[in-house]
Amino acid sequence: MITAPVAATPAKAASPSTLYQRICLGYSVSAVSISLDEAVDLARTGDVWLFRGHAMADRAIQLATNSPVNHVGMSVAIEDLPPLMWHAELGRALPDVWTGTRHRGVQLHDLREAVIVWAARYGQRAWLRQLDPVVTGEMEDAALATIARLDGTPFPSTARLASRWLAGRAPTRTRQGGGADLETAYCAQLLAVTYQAMGLLPGSRRPGRYDPGSFWSGDNLGLSAGFRLGGEIAVHLPAGGARMPHTPAAPG
């Protein structure tokens, strides 16, 4: 169980609405920092999670995709279900909520547990970007349909990841949107395909053109239908971390 760190002078926690107002006002990353508990309370479908690590595998992905971050995922918060994380990774530390099994590649995880694994076990810094306005029921249905179609898709090798990123930037006369099934999927491509299905990104752009850094505020993502992502919110775990799953896994 995650507990808030003990402070010498307890301060009243900001409500989710107050936190969101601060984010929309454009506070910098250093000015907005919240606990994992607060981040989970804020979770809405379509919110983006960004991770940056310093291990060799993390740096390889950053170099291969020319990105300042090495992993990206999306919050899924549907009705009475606990908040979930939709992403693609090499690890299999957590059971996939959709299938009930542990596997590599495209996965749907408990949001809190996924952030704990990435921040505490893999040594990653975590940031949250909230999507505004709230998505519609039809957009949530499109996200769930994408989850049903792509959950379990394998994660590509680092070499294939780099080649796909380069291919995504090559000019083409053929429209390649997010409708086609994927043989493999890395995290940013998965998020792009899901956003395209939800109508948040144009379907005319290749999903392979996106890398984790495309979803960082320093890039011009250009969402559709008047949607926007707020600034990065640094998310911190409580002092002492949390108990990790026992299954060995490697980040991706």
Can you name each region flagged by the protein language model?
Residues 1-252:
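Cysteine-nucleophile amide-bond enzymes
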